[in-house]
Each structure stands twice: as structure tokens, then as C-alpha cells.
Design a protein with these regions (language model features):
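N-terminal flexible/basic segments that precede or flank functional cores
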Residues: 1-29, 97-149
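Short basic helix-loop element that most often maps to the first helix and adjoining turn
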Residues: 2-3, 32-51
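Short, contiguous strand/loop micro-motifs
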Residues: 20-22, 32, 62-66
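Helix-turn-helix/winged-helix DNA-binding modules
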Residues: 29, 40, 68-71
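Recognition helix of helix-turn-helix/homeodomain-like DNA-binding domains
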Residues: 52-70
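DNA major-groove recognition helix of helix-turn-helix/homeodomain DNA-binding modules
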Residues: 73-89
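Short C-terminal boundary/hinge segments that cap the last helix of small helical domains
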Residues: 84-100
Length: 149
């Protein structure tokens, strides 16, 4: 991606992901969304199987696979559709924003580089000190290089 568009893209993605942040804070039901929604709506596994045009045991297998994090997106989408739901998913940064994620990665890379150089210089009795300032400067350089101001 061209550097001049990277900052704009980060802002756009952060705006798109904002509603998902609140959803990410709510845990999945212990037995999964499929089972929770099916039971709450009073829909039998047989009804789901009929809509999916499959065996009666498959909906229960899908519910178990979802609860165990083994279900595919394709299967989850089909099961959601059979329940009259849409599958909505997103990758949500663990921090507040995607930009913070990028900055943290750049800072970690800069710190590794600066500490490596500082260590080499210390071995040669030329240590400069001020590691924090060097890390911050290197972080800013890396972000500028990626087109992020």
C-alpha cells in the first residue's frame, strides 16, 4: 500500500472497527452462539437441519464445533442463516485502535534494534545511554517510513 494512503486507511479501519470493540468485550455464551440463539428462539435442531437440507445431527455437530473453536466460517455462516441471523465478524485490535497496534509494533522493533546497538557499543566501551530517547526517535522514523504521521 502506498505510504500516503496508509494513515488514511488506518483511520478508516479504526472508524469501521469502533462498533466491534464493544461487542468484543462481551464473551461468547459457554455453549456457543448457535446453540444459545437456537434455544432462545425456540428452534429445534431438526428445524435447522431442514433449512440446511442436511441430517438432523449436523446442527448439533456445528454447535459443538463452534463451542470448541473448530467451525469454519462457511459452516457458521450457513448455520446463522438457517437461524435467520447474519454472521458478522471482524479482527479487533486488543488496544484501543489499529494505529496504536501499529505504533506498539514499531516501538517494539525500534527497542530491539536500539538495545542491540547499545549492547554492541557497551561491549566496545562506547555506550551512549539515553536508550529511551533513541527508541522514541527510531519509532518515529519507522512510522514515517511506513507513511504514518
Amino acid at each position: 500500500m502506498r505510504n500516503e494512503f496508509r494513515t488514511l486507511r488506518l483511520k478508516q479501519l479504526d472508524r469501521i472497527l469502533k462498533p466491534f470493540r464493544a461487542a468484543a468485550k462481551n464473551p461468547r455464551p459457554p455453549k456457543g452462539w448457535l446453540r444459545a440463539i437456537r434455544e432462545a428462539a425456540g428452534i429445534s435442531a431438526s428445524e435447522v437441519a431442514r433449512v440446511l437440507k442436511t441430517s438432523r445431527g449436523l446442527p448439533v455437530q456445528l454447535e459443538k464445533a463452534e463451542a470448541e473453536d473448530r467451525i469454519t466460517l462457511k459452516s457458521l455462516r450457513a448455520a446463522a442463516n438457517a437461524l435467520g441471523c447474519d454472521l458478522v465478524y471482524a479482527l479487533v485490535p486488543k488496544g484501543e485502535t489499529l494505529r496504536e497496534l501499529v505504533e506498539e509494533r514499531a516501538r517494539a522493533q525500534a527497542k530491539r534494534q536500539v538495545l542491540s546497538v547499545e549492547h554492541s557499543m557497551a561491549l566496545e566501551d562506547q555506550a551512549v545511554g539515553r536508550v529511551d530517547e533513541a527508541v522514541e526517535a527510531e519509532t518515529k522514523r519507522r512510522l514515517r517510513k511506513r507513511g504514518i504521521e
